A protein has these predicted regions:
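Hydrophobic membrane-insertion alpha-helices, especially the h-region
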Residues: 5-19, 597-608
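Positively charged n-region of N-terminal signal peptides that target proteins for export
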Residues: 1-4, 589
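Soluble extramembrane regions of membrane proteins in the secretory/endomembrane system
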Residues: 23-330
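Cytosolic-side membrane-insertion boundary helix
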Residues: 313-343, 361-364, 408-410
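Peri-membrane helix termini and adjoining interfacial loops of integral membrane proteins
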Residues: 18-21, 313-318, 390-396
Length: 628
């Protein structure tokens, strides 16, 4: 009976997650004038992305002249701002095969202004870069962003005059060092008039456009984004965890420059189809649904800002996340403590009722928490080992060609890591105490050695391996009951939530929201049927697993695309949360051995899928790379 509930819940969770990751259908050329149309924008993409147009190239001059005409034709007051590129940028351009001398070591920004009814009000800027790397026509990066801005301007004009002025900033030399953005924000007369900026980027050729960066102190910005962005075709994909993580990464885009000046705003990008990044990125392979998604979000947010009574001001950072792309749920950071307290109280109700009627003990809850700790530690080790089968870590790539090939292998890496996490979940659900402890510990030690040899020294892998091996050598610590395993996992997740709430409250929702849902369902199930055998208790458990698991599946894909190249263990962390929902649906005792054998088969399949990436996406030979 439980196996049927488990299968149904997982199937529904996968369906919900996959549906939440879909891009909207591209609007056709005859869409309403006030709406964004990807097909209309594609005409600009096709003009821009005929060939690579890096700084200093003949095609760069062609694109620049054509964009000036387009901006003027849209009714914007258009000027060209020039400024020097840095020595470092010039050296980087040369290494990529470009010619900074042909550009006279100069970046040329295109600046267009659509005056508002009250030019004294702070203006809103739409920003994208029009240069490309020498080896790519850049249909996605960033012709899609430029074309989306042109179509957005057209639609805004069709909606009627706005109070605020709109500044269109098409920057140059972004690919070699953000030089164009530095030139504009470093001294253009308009820079101090701009109160909000929306930047459009791409690191791939498709997928949903994620809003992954804001100005600091973003509570008011997120409030506006939550109202305006959800009106966009396909809704929004964004959460404060992405903002928190990106803030601490070494990466930068043009948005970095105004952000560091204290300007509020939004940074949007799609990162699916990673094989197209700085590679073959022609108009015919660009995901038009991705263009519709990023453009529609740019339009709705820019229009809301232009017509707002006051622009968002920096306050505090908000804790927020989208729910299946359709609504933004947000709250102040301090509310996290209240959510944690409520979840602990509900877990207490579940534990008290299960202890009274099902014999649950504190020791069994502790064993359940150790089960979760073993899953997380083993997951970090095994996903890292499986990831290295697909190629070196990014820091050891050795060349640009190897790095871009690794990006192309991301789908294989993701599939391999996901299968690995699934195998571990099956092991926990089947009762990890059953396999020989020496075999389990030895397998984890071998995986750790593989990860360290192929991936390089990693303190995280070493620490996780020690924890996982130690817990494997003491199988008596594994949970023996469904209630012990379930409540222990909830307690572990809430403990992680408490630590995160203390150190990084913007990221704590990842633990607190699912933990609160799981605790509430556990309390309900304990009151309805402590034996966890009747549909009255199993139905809400399965429903929570489907909804909560579906949300986590939708979250896991952009997380892996963003950081999975170097941190594949992020899927193990998300897998722990899914495991928390499905743990009470563990199979009956008689199904343990086939369950564990199936887990081993899934683990082997995960390694094979990841390793196949080397065959499916080989590193191009140097001669082939030069010819490209």
């Amino acid at each position: 009976m439980r196996l049927l509930w488990l299968t149904g819940a997982l199937a529904l969770a996968l369906l919900i997650g996959v549906l939440s990751l879909q891009v909207p259908a591209p609007a056709g050329p005859h869409a309403p004038a006030t709406a964004f149309s990807a097909e209309r924008a594609m005409a600009d993409v096709q003009e821009l992305a005929q060939r690579p147009h890096p700084v200093g190239s003949a095609d760069h001059a062609r694109v620049q002249a054509w964009l000036q005409q387009r901006l003027t034709g849209l009714g914007l007051e258009t000027t060209v701002q020039t400024g020097p590129i840095s020595r470092g940028s010039a050296r980087y351009l040369r290494r990529m095969g470009g010619d900074p001398e042909a550009a006279n070591f100069t970046a040329a920004n295109l600046v267009g202004v659509l005056p508002g009814r009250d030019p004294a009000l702070p203006a809103v800027a739409l920003m994208a870069h029009y240069d490309t790397v020498p080896m790519s026509a850049g249909a996605a990066d960033d012709s899609a962003g430029v074309a989306a801005i042109l179509e957005t301007v057209r639609a805004i004009r069709a909606r009627g005059p706005a109070e605020r002025s709109l500044v269109v900033l098409l920057t140059d030399a972004e690919e070699i060092g953000l030089d164009g953005a530095r030139v504009f924000w470093g001294g253009h007369p308009l820079r101090d008039r701009i109160g909000a900026v929306i930047n459009l980027e791409a690191r791939g050729g498709g997928g949903r456009a994620m809003m992954f960066e804001t100005g600091r102190g973003n509570a008011e910005t997120i409030a506006l984004f939550g109202r305006a962005g959800v009106r966009a075709d396909g809704g929004v994909t964004s959460n404060s965890l992405a903002v928190f993580v990106y803030e601490r990464m070494p990466n930068g885009t043009d948005f970095t420059i105004p952000k560091n000046r204290g300007v509020q705003g939004l940074n949007l990008a799609f990162i699916g189809r990673p094989e197209q990044y700085h590679a073959h990125s022609a108009p015919e392979v660009l995901d038009r649904g991705a263009l519709q998604h990023i453009g529609s979000q740019a339009l709705e947010n820019a229009d809301a800002l232009l017509r707002a009574g006051a622009l968002p001001a920096p306050t505090v950072n908000s804790v927020y996340a989208d729910l299946f792309g359709r609504v933004i749920l947000r709250h102040p950071p301090a509310v996290g403590w209240g959510l944690l307290a409520l979840a602990v109280a509900l877990l207490g109700v579940a534990g008290w009722q299960a202890g009274r009627r099902a014999g649950l003990t504190f020791a069994e809850v502790g064993r359940g928490a150790l089960d979760g700790l073993w899953f997380l530690a083993a997951g970090l080790v095994l996903t890292h080992a499986v990831r290295t089968l697909a190629g070196p870590m990014a820091a050891r790539a050795g060349s640009a060609e190897t790095y871009y090939t690794l990006l192309a292998r991301l789908p294989w890496m993701e599939a391999g890591a996901a299968l690995t996490v699934l195998a571990l979940a099956m092991a926990v659900m089947g009762g990890r105490a059953r396999p020989d402890r020496r075999i389990s510990a030895g397998a984890l030690a071998a995986a750790a050695v593989l990860a360290l040899v192929l991936g390089g020294l990693s303190p995280i892998v070493i620490g996780a391996a020690l924890v996982a091996i130690a817990l494997s050598l003491f199988p008596g610590l594994a949970a023996r009951s469904a209630w012990g395993g379930w409540t222990g996992l909830i307690a572990l997740v809430l403990g992680l939530g408490a630590v995160t709430q203390l150190l990084a409250p913007e990221a704590a929702f990842l633990f607190l929201w699912p933990g609160l849902l799981a605790a509430a369902v556990a309390a309900l199930a304990a009151l309805l049927d402590p034996g966890l055998t009747r549909p009255a208790a199993l139905a809400p458990v399965a429903l929570a697993a489907a909804v909560g698991g579906g949300w986590l599946v939708g979250l896991s894909h952009p997380v892996f695309l963003g950081i999975g190249l170097d941190l594949p263990g992020a899927l193990a962390l998300i897998g722990l949360l899914v495991l928390m929902f499905i743990r009470p649906l563990s199979p009956e005792r008689g199904a343990v051995r086939p369950w564990l054998m199936a887990a081993l088969a899934v683990l082997v399949l995960g390694g094979a899928v990841s390793g196949w990436a080397r065959v499916a996406e080989p590193v191009p030979a140097p001669a082939a790379a030069e010819a490209a």
